[in-house]
Amino acid sequence: MKKISLPKIGIRPVIDGRRMGVRESLEEQTMNMAKATAALLTEKLRHACGAAVECVISDTCIAGMAEAAACEEKFSSQNVGLTITVTPCWCYGSETIDMDPTRPKAIWGFNGTERPGAVYLAAALAAHSQKGIPAFSIYGHDVQDADDTSIPADVEEKLLRFARAGLAVASMKGKSYLSLGGVSMGIAGSIVDHNFFESWLGMKVQAVDMTELRRRIDQKIYDEAELEMALAWADKNFRYGEDENNKQYQRNAEQSRAVLRESLLMAMCIRDMMQGNSKLADIGRVEESLGYNAIAAGFQGQRHWTDQYPNGDTAEAILNSSFDWNGVRKPFVVATENDSLNGVAMLMGHQLTGTAQIFADVRTYWSPEAIERVTGHKLDGLAEHGIIHLINSGSAALDGSCKQRDSEGKPTMKPHWEISQQEADACLAATEWCPAIHEYFRGGGYSSRFLTEGGVPFTMTRVNIIKGLGPVLQIAEGWSVELPKDVHDILNKRTNSTWPTTWFAPRLTGKGPFTDVYSVMANWGANHGVLTIGHVGADFITLASMLRIPVCMHNVEETKVYRPSAWAAHGMDIEGQDYRACQNYGPLYKR
């Protein structure tokens, strides 16, 4: 099969078309602006898979309809998924704009006095607004000289934020969500909404019964040599935690080995179902070798699978991590309990940062008073106003232990192309594999248990669907918190201590849902959330606006909120603008 190419960024230099001196005097400056933009983006950005970002520049500057059409023809042939129009001068507004209705687009109008780049920017944005095709405005804060080829810091920030979000939009389009199973324990997020995926994300849903996973395992539709490699890797790297089951439910060595074997097979088969595997064609399984073109997946598990077979905890944890028996590699996006809406939040976070994601229950709010009563410990520092216990048996990537290190030696989660094998090994060494609790998982399994290091910046997100409104996005920036070991042990043993934990302290604003930590917990829209490394809420906001998903809750500084220019015409309060604009324009891929 022909490999699907990655989306590219189109750069559109537009120019005043008047010959006999005007256009000629601007050609070099305008094209250099396009080249500088392309150089910035290719230097600073990568696709989530680690591949370099490519920019495609129009063959000529664009002065009118003919050159705009020629540019569009070139872009259409090269899989351009988003565009940035650049100019230092006046040009002819609606004659030169990008008219593709679903392609994210921005315009950078140079802030200079010699030629009115800002005037074109305003005229072009007015045309976009009038035609119902929103575009992002980029305009430097300070005036630059005409011969200044540098890109100011504020312009660079907007170019990169737009491009990150636009690449996420383009990368999701045309892919699928693999729904492996159905609704898990009545969890609304696992009632997979095909219209949401199709209309807002441009994706399809591939619904597959869990018996397909059973069939692949039982009929050996996998690479048997790879299974042996996976088992050897687990034997070398897995540390096992205590078995907290009653004696009658504890498994002997042979039974435990069978559970481990099937857990690793589940990871292999789910991966093959998502992306395909040419090795399957070699054993005569050509249809299965193709996969389902899935950029994200979810596994129902509970209870129709887990009452009889090993749970998905090991498979999900390994797939979501940036490494396995094949070494360091791109993480997959697999939502536990087939919570497709949390899966979408994971997908967004992964596309924006290139990193693995932490799937968790938003389990418990611990007030400072409650912790002091139970443990005698008085919270301070980042945790002084209370903390939220994020914990779940399944999809937390092992990267979430934060045993990787940034350039300053601080704990973090890095994109896979920056992770060393030593850092991957450190994450494995920080993880224990605990036998699943029989009362919950009768078929057995192993849950990963680790504790996220403290002081790490995170952004917690969640997508919810509201009847009559559609999808909404929640965002809470904050930090992981490290508690004294004895305090952690006391709190952790009050719940399921065989699962991975992140203690999370959201950044408070003193207003609305961020009045206090309790309010964050009380306003969270579902039982699950996702942690993405870094304070990247602004990127999520920009991405959501491209997809026309309003943000119902966030604690991002107002100066960092970046949405299409037309949002400003939808009222004076920026969050109300977001709702009205998203309702006005409707989902990006209207159906």
Curated annotation (Swiss-Prot):
Judging by the UniProt lineage, the source's domain of life is Bacteria
The catalytic residues are 337, 361
Give GO MF terms, alphabetically. Answer: arabinose isomerase activity; L-fucose isomerase activity; manganese ion binding
Q: What is its main location?
A: cytoplasm
Gene Ontology cellular component terms for the protein in this record: cytoplasm
Q: Does the keyword Isomerase apply?
A: yes
What Pfam families would the database entry show? Fucose_iso_C, Fucose_iso_N1, Fucose_iso_N2
Where does the chain bind Mn(2+)?
337, 361, 528
Give compartment(s).
Answer: Cytoplasm
Which pathway, metabolic or otherwise, does it act in? Carbohydrate degradation; L-fucose degradation; L-lactaldehyde and glycerone phosphate from L-fucose: step 1/3
Keywords assigned by UniProt? Carbohydrate metabolism, Cytoplasm, Fucose metabolism, Isomerase, Manganese, Metal-binding
Q: Which biological process terms from the Gene Ontology are attached to this UniProt entry?
A: D-arabinose catabolic process; L-fucose catabolic process
What reaction does this catalyse? L-fucose = L-fuculose
Q: So what EC number does this one have?
A: 5.3.1.25
Q: Which coenzymes or cofactors are required?
A: Mn(2+)
Q: Which family does it belong to?
A: Belongs to the L-fucose isomerase family.
Tell me the subunit arrangement: Homohexamer.
Question: Which purpose does this protein serve, as stated in its record?
Answer: Converts the aldose L-fucose into the corresponding ketose L-fuculose.
Concerning PANTHER family, the annotation shows: L-FUCOSE ISOMERASE
Instruction: Identify this protein by name.
Output: L-fucose isomerase
Q: Could you read off the lineage of the organism from its UniProt record? A: Bacteria, Pseudomonadati, Pseudomonadota, Gammaproteobacteria, Enterobacterales
